[in-house]
Regions:
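Conserved ATP-binding/catalytic segment of the ANL
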Residues: 201-239
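Gly/Ser/Thr-rich phosphate-binding loop
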Residues: 99, 111-179
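AMP-binding/adenylate-forming
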Residues: 26-49, 53-111, 149
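Conserved adenylation A10 loop of the ANL superfamily
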Residues: 12-28
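Charged, glycine/proline-rich intrinsically disordered loops and linkers
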Residues: 1-2, 167-184, 225-232
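Short beta-strand-to-turn element immediately C-terminal to the catalytic PLP-Schiff-base lysine
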Residues: 29-31, 161-165, 196
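Catalytic cores of nucleotide-enabled group-transfer and carboxylate-activating enzymes in metabolic
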Residues: 168, 178-181, 185-191, 196-199, ...
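Conserved pre-ATP/AMP-binding loop-to-beta segment of ANL
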Residues: 2-17, 47-53
Length: 239
């Protein structure tokens, strides 16, 4: 298990590195106050408790690995295991746990294993993110019994920020139809948002800076439901 000084992180803050999926990788410092706000959202959104058992297979230097479930689990005193992702052993390992965070690449790798179609993911919570999660992946994991939460966040905010929780196939098909197959951001929002020229702006205590952050992500809203339309050429900050 990777050794992480969670106590020091909570007391002193932490610098995380962006994955580079939205541009040049950069370092973002998260203050103790910001981490407290992010923890509160992550715990509420994913229904994490002291009895949860979290299996982390993503890097601790990234927001997805550290902030989505690992730091919240430590804060709650929940069971936590950190290990490298192995698609051939993951499904067996995950049987002893309740929550995990997977990228779409992880999810695709699991779907392509021999044992996936016979797996029982009932009672398992799978947070998906870092890249947009396509509908086929959401459907296949829910079909196996999992609760799936495709989530939008960034190294600068959240990372649990905008999402939807899926736990039955009718719901998956309905949302997919409403969004006409476009990637989903979600309809549960944990910060202030506005859309300017189709670009998503975010603001709130889970953001590393004050004022509005121009995300560089293009979105479309259907009522309170948001879909992802792609990236602008660059990501700028605005107060």
């Amino acid at each position: 298990m990777e050794v992480v000084d969670f106590k020091s992180i909570l007391s002193n803050g932490v610098t995380i590195t962006s994955s580079g999926t939205t541009g040049t990788p950069k370092e973002i410092f998260r203050t103790p106050e910001n981490l407290k706000a992010c923890n509160a959202v992550a715990i509420d959104a994913q229904k994490l408790t002291s009895k949860s058992r979290v299996l982390t297979v993503t890097r601790m230097t990234h927001a997805g690995g550290l902030l989505t479930q690992s730091l919240p689990a430590y804060t709650l005193g929940a069971e936590l295991k950190i290990q490298q992702f192995n698609p051939y052993t993951f499904l067996k390992d995950f049987q002893s746990y309740t929550h995990t965070f997977l990228t779409p690449a992880h999810m695709k790798a699991l779907v392509n294993t021999k044992g996936f179609k016979d797996s029982n993911l009932a009672g398992k919570f799978v947070l998906g993110g870092s890249d947009p999660v396509d509908w086929d992946l959401i459907y296949k994991f829910v079909y196996q019994g999992a609760t799936v939460m495709p989530n939008w966040g960034m190294s600068e905010i959240g990372p649990i920020t905008i999402n939807t929780t899926f736990n039955d196939l009718v719901q998956v098909l309905h949302y997919r139809h409403v969004l006409k197959g476009e990637f989903i951001l979600g309809d549960c929002v944990y910060c202030d948002i506005k859309i300017v020229d189709n670009e998503l702006y975010v603001r709130g205590s889970i953001c590393y800076q004050e004022g509005w952050l121009a995300t560089g992500d293009l979105v479309e809203s259907i009522g309170k439901l948001f879909s992802y339309k792609g990236r602008k050429n660059s990501c700028n900050h605005s107060n």
